[in-house]
Amino acid sequence: MNVIEIYNEKQIFHLKTREFSYIIQVLETGDLVHRYFGKKIEKFSDGNKITYLDRSFSPSPITGDRTYSLDVLPLEYSSNGLGDFRTSALDVRNEFGVTLDLKYKEYRLYKGKKELRGLPASFGNQEEVESLEIDLYDQLTDITVTLQYSVFEEASYLARSATIQTGKYPCKLEKVLSATLDFPHQDFIVHSLAGRYAYEKEWTQTPLTKGQYSIGSIRGASSHSRTPFLALASPDAGEDKGDVYAAHLVYSGNFTAFVETTAMETSRLGLGLESHYFSWQLDKDDRFQTPEVLLSYTDKGFTDMTQNSHHFITKHLIRSSFVNKPRPILINNWEATYFEFTEEKILQLAQVASRAGIELFVLDDGWFGKRNNDESSLGDWKVNLDKLPNGLNGLAERINELGMKFGLWFEPEMISIDSDLYREHPDWAIRTEGRLPIYSREQLVLDLTKQEVCDYIIDSVSSILESANISYVKWDMNRNITNIPEGLANDQRFEFHHRYMLGLYRVLDHLTKRFPDILFESCAGGGGRNDLGIMYYMPQAWASDDTDAIERLSIQEGTSLIYPSSSIGAHVSAVPNHQVGRITPLATRGNVAMMGGAFGYELDLTKLSEKELDEISQQIETYHSIRDTIQFGQLYRLKKTSNTWAANYVSQDKNQVVFTFVKILAKPEAPLLHVRLKGLDPDALYECPQLGETFYGDELMNIGLTMPHVQKDYFSVQYIFNKI
């Protein structure tokens, strides 16, 4: 079967995946329009023609034909000036003004997929993906827009991006989206992931009404409060039914994502670079590549959307060799010691961790320069020998002797005013001349638009990584960008944020290729830059600085809505919790963190009782037996109320099921709650050691389980079912 079918006589392009069809057409005028995106159809006859009507106040570019207006056509990639008053995909300014008349020129079809220069993007071999490029051309300005489509048939995803190419004349890009998509109706619920610091990835649902629903970031990062992702769902969509269109932007900086309705009750979805703080100067014979948008569709609801997303990201987006490797159980010393540690204290903590069965020890902030608080030394990546007299190499050797790997925290994009680096290179910090610097967490951001700054980060981080047996890096970023520096020419000032991101991607590309055996975890005060652009380089992310088990229920649910469980860092922490003060049972803290994905601990084990340490050892033993199922199995969200949460994972071979239920608060005379599991082999017999019973798969999926009636706050159970 051809993944991309071209009906040349009608100039129709039919892109097909396992689940959906995506159809575009060239009209007789040369305009490229969108005809269909939805459940897969085998053939497209074009029997249902586009209807042309005379619409008042919708101008026509064709003299004498009042029925033809771009304002009501489902355009594939729109521009300004010819009568489409909806939000455009591309705005340019040059000596001819601001109008573009983009007409179809030609197409190219090939197996495989090209890399996007300087940008993270999906990938696949010639058997997995087929690509189409369509050139649109404006004759007056000599500008060519190339729309790039890559069809992943088995994974059921479509990748889209655009390239803007100048010819004889320069121009300035004032807005350039990666993709827009027109729908023939507006009957949608918009799903997005919102939040704030320590409360990331809240799954929100908003009915689409008259006007525009828009999210984005101008922080220089995708941010805690927004994620570059939107899903449009039919009003009846649930976990197991309904239409869901998902769109991801593979980018980590300023972005916009919107869906708007029109007077004709159609809608337009768009994603790309945020335009208020963006412009880009193109010289003659110059080009600009947009970030990539990933599109999917299912008629089977949000569970199928999630599982498709997990599969695609794991197979076609995460570049790291760790993508299919089990993530180690780690302990991070941050909430155990903060900045107040010595080598002796670290080794005491490591010894207890080793006895418990922990596999990786991560040394967090405070190991370098004169870093005894958050007011100094960022940028001075040299070991503090007062704290670590045997250096990183000596510490790593001692950790390795205990049977654990050694990991290290960095914040390479930042600089402290009180640092040797700032005293030597104050011009490397992002700040506006003539104005006081804007501090956040007593630090400034390094200017990654400068090659010498990127080179310094690469060299200084590499030097540390080569100095000891380091197996893991936690790459943090604890503030957003404020000032735009004066260093760029006036006509390039608004290129800064995108140039910064290109610099960061260059650094990450170099370091992750240079150190392929190191597991890189991203962090930005938790989930402040947890997006697909960063995940391309770093297969694991610290989901949130909030480690409270109850708070983590919604954070991890929202994160796992689109990101694979193997990428989600989740830790057991101390009580009272350091963020919210809540006291939860160790069992619940463990159960919730295990369901997050990449499991670990972040507390002072040396202060725990023998009973607590025995319980932690048992948690670790349990997690060893279920790690593959949780990190690489299928996730199913189950019955949820305002006071309860439940989910189960099913291993790829359906031989194991891990079920977790959490009740937040005890209620008087509470009714019994029954939960039905999902995804099991219906004919198989499963044994559950926690219950001492056996169950058939269809029994668990249709009758379900009655939850224990326990009068305790923050109660949870974990049941493991193994196929007999």
Per-range role (PLM):
Residues 71-74, 79-110, 116, 242-253, ...:
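Glycine-rich, aromatic-flanked loop segments that form ligand/cofactor-binding clefts
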Residues 359-367, 458-489:
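Active-site groove signature of glycoside hydrolases
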Residues 19, 162, 285, 331, ...:
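Conserved, mostly hydrophobic/aromatic
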Residues 337-423, 455-459, 499-509:
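Aromatic- and glycine-enriched glycan-recognition loops and surfaces
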Residues 17-18, 37, 505-695, 709-710, ...:
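Active-site-proximal substrate-binding groove within the catalytic cores of carbohydrate-active enzymes
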Residues 101-104, 280-299, 715-721:
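Short Pro-Gly-centered flexible turn/kink motifs
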Residues 326-328, 335, 339, 412-463, ...:
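Active-site-adjacent "subsite" loops/lids of carbohydrate-active enzymes
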Residues 6, 10-14, 32-260, 276, ...:
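Polysaccharide-binding surfaces and accessory modules of carbohydrate-active proteins
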